[in-house]
Amino acid sequence: MTDDSLGGARAIEHRTVSRKTPADGKLEITKSAAGRLEPLGAQFALLVDGTPGDAALGMMPCTCRGHDKAHVHYFVESDLLRSLAAGSEVDLFLDEDARRLLVVTA
């Protein structure tokens, strides 16, 4: 994917793909990135290494650090994300004009 194909999209995050993503299609993101994606709505357009599809923003309450340190995990969910290799690095770009998220293998 070239800079030209990113259009006016802005980088919002750099992530390492977890070992779970290829199995469940969920790419964990930060609270800040989730906040940037919220205006796109419940479902939004997604482009993963040039392949188009749809995605949803998800969140899950968690106590993985103990009950006294409850927090929330945020993620982008799509079957397209299953194509990402665990341990690979990806960059997330938000194209606000096209109302879509681009995920590009770094």
Q: Where do the language-model regions lie?
A:
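Acidic, low-complexity intrinsically disordered regions
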Residues: 1-106
